[in-house]
Structures are given as C-alpha cells and as structure tokens.
Amino acid sequence: MSRVCQLTGTRANNGMAVSHSHIRTKKLQQANLQQRRLWWAEGNRWIKLRVTTRALKTIQKKGLGPYAKSLGINLAKL
C-alpha cells in the first residue's frame, strides 16, 4: 500500500537534512497517515480510509460526506 492520503492525495515530500557543518543529505518527509474507520452517515455504513491527520481535522469540522464531495470523491466506490 502506497503512503498516500486517499482523500487529499498528500504524499511524501523530498527535502534536505542539513547538519551543523552544512552537509546536506536527501531526506523524505512522510505524511502523517492514519488508518481509520469512519462513519459515513449518507451511506449508512463504515468506511476504512488511510488519511492524513490534517484531513481528519477537516472531517471533524465539515463531516465526511460534504468534505469528500468538495474534493470530488465518490465514497460509494470505496
């Protein structure tokens, strides 16, 4: 399973680790992904999703159905 948020599509970022002597080495900054079982009220069922914690905060604020609709995601296919 790839490390990608199923709702937002957030993935790893390429960055640099810089030491005190300014030696730079490549580093991957992974997204904070969590496997969650979320209740979808409109579909009247549970949905398992791998989402970022940022997406979880937005789901708590807006709700799963409206948030997925704003992103153009059909939850019935998941």
Curated annotation (Swiss-Prot):
GO cellular component terms attached to this protein's record: ribonucleoprotein complex; ribosome
Gene3D superfamilies registered for this protein in UniProt: Ribosomal protein L28/L24
SUPFAM superfamilies according to UniProt: L28p-like
Keyword Ribosomal protein: yes
Disulfide bonds: none
Highest taxon listed in the record's lineage: Bacteria
Entry-linked InterPro entries: Ribosomal_bL28 (IPR026569), Ribosomal_bL28/bL31-like_sf (IPR034704), Ribosomal_bL28_bact-type (IPR001383), Ribosomal_bL28_sf (IPR037147)
Single Gene Ontology MF annotation: structural constituent of ribosome
Keywords: Ribonucleoprotein, Ribosomal protein
BP-aspect Gene Ontology terms: translation
PANTHER family in the record: 39S RIBOSOMAL PROTEIN L28, MITOCHONDRIAL, LARGE RIBOSOMAL SUBUNIT PROTEIN BL28M
Similarity comment text for this entry: Belongs to the bacterial ribosomal protein bL28 family.
Name the record gives this protein: Large ribosomal subunit protein bL28
Organism expressing this protein natively: Synechococcus sp. (strain CC9902)
